[in-house]
Amino acid sequence: MAEESSKAVKYYTLEEIQKHNNSKSTWLILHYKVYDLTKFLEEHPGGEEVLREQAGGDATENFEDVGHSTDARELSKTFIIGELHPDDRSKITKPSESIITTIDSNPSWWTNWLIPAISALFVALIYHLYTSEN
């Protein structure tokens, strides 16, 4: 007999997932899928602390930032227990566009000219004092 491929999807609310945020029950969300990683904590190559920090919440951004291998992605599928309920998907923070604080691209004149000029004068003064002693 063929395995039933159209199993009903088990949905979990965000509130329910957030309760599983400890070493006895470690759940997290990746791409709206819910994973129970409790039994994988000690086997995780990055250490169990990494998973426990993300437990009970959405770890999608951190998971993608690490750049997991194809093998790791395949292994992760074995821990899927369901999906985040569609009503709660808007509640998790999507990876925000990072706010980058930039320094003015046109720095003031003193950083471009005054500091190098003072440095050059200082070097010239030291050179002059050094050569006048001989």
From Swiss-Prot:
Keyword Ligase: no
Residues bearing the modification N-acetylalanine: A2
Phylogenetic placement of the source organism: Eukaryota, Metazoa, Chordata, Craniata, Vertebrata
Keyword set, alphabetical order: Acetylation, Electron transport, Endoplasmic reticulum, Heme, Iron, Membrane, Metal-binding, Microsome, Transmembrane, Transmembrane helix, Transport
Cytochrome b5 heme-binding domain boundaries: 9-85
SUPFAM superfamilies reported for this sequence: Cytochrome b5-like heme/steroid binding domain (SSF55856)
UniProt-recorded Gene Ontology molecular function terms: heme binding; metal ion binding
Protein encoded by which gene: CYB5A
Subcellular location: Endoplasmic reticulum membrane; Microsome membrane
UniProt protein name: Cytochrome b5
Record-annotated membrane-spanning stretches: 109-131
Entry-linked Gene3D superfamilies: Cytochrome b5-like heme/steroid binding domain
Residues holding heme: H44, H68
Name of a matching Pfam family: Cyt-b5
Disulfide bonds: none
